[in-house]
Regions:
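Short secondary-structure transition/capping segments
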Residues: 7-11, 51-54, 101-104, 143-144, ...
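Active-site adenylate/phosphate-handling loop in enzymes that bind or generate adenylated species
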Residues: 4-90
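Short secondary-structure capping/turn micro-motifs that flank functional sites
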Residues: 3-5, 47-48, 97-98, 138, ...
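Short, hinge-like loop/turn segments at secondary-structure boundaries
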Residues: 14-17, 56-59, 107, 150, ...
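Mid-to-C-terminal catalytic subdomains of enzymes
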Residues: 68-74, 78-122, 129-130
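Peripheral terminal appendages
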Residues: 35, 117-192
Length: 192
């Protein structure tokens, strides 16, 4: 359980590295017991061009990344999966819930479950890509720009249901959904 580890619970900038290192060390021990010599994971070509500190742990531990090694992008992986009849091909990405909080904000199950419940409400009501990013008492809704009008049309119900979960201030991010939005500013701080 990653949140049992203080170094991860404190949510540092290298949280993903620490978590992946822990996860893959555990998997490596299990694989060794089973006689498995090679472990592979799902990093793709696109992941190599954005802030992904977990990739460092993958490389350090000698885990293979066949999709990235083949130069396959996320879209190419989705197309291949669809061609093979794999249902996950059309599923929206679901990154770690810790990405919904700013670095340094302490992680705990209660807040992560609350964010997850809020995202599920938004998925049911407006669909598409949805993230709730929590900044203290402000929760920022990220969704696809083409879903803004639907979000505003259902504004009162969205606000009511999110407040029932305990969110105080609810905003719609006019930049829309974007992967890695909590990493904005890391380069200027020399942390990416």
């Amino acid at each position: 359980d990653e949140l049992e580890m203080e170094e991860i619970r404190s949510n540092p900038v290298n949280r993903c590295y620490l978590c992946k290192r822990n996860l893959f060390r555990t998997l490596m021990a299990f694989a060794k017991e089973k006689g498995v010599e090679v472990l592979a994971e799902g990093t793709n070509e696109d992941d190599l061009h954005v802030y992904r500190p977990g990739i460092q742990a993958v490389r350090e531990l000698g885990i293979r990344s066949p999709l990235a090694e083949a130069g396959l992008t996320k879209e190419e992986v989705r197309r291949l999966a669809a061609a093979c009849g794999i249902s996950a091909a059309s599923r929206p990405s679901t990154p770690c819930m810790a990405t919904r909080l700013p670095y340094g904000a302490r992680l705990d199950y209660e807040i992560l479950k609350k964010i997850e419940a809020g995202e599920e409400i938004l998925r049911r009501m407006i669909g598409g890509n949805v993230r709730l990013r929590l900044h203290g008492q402000v929760v920022r809704i990220e969704t696809d720009p083409e879903r803004f009008s639907l979000a505003l049309e259902k504004r009162e119900e969205v606000v009511r249901q999110l407040k029932e979960l305990g969110f105080v201030y609810i905003t719609l991010d006019l930049e829309g959904f974007r992967s890695g939005s909590m990493d904005v500013g890391l380069e200027s701080r020399g942390e990416s």
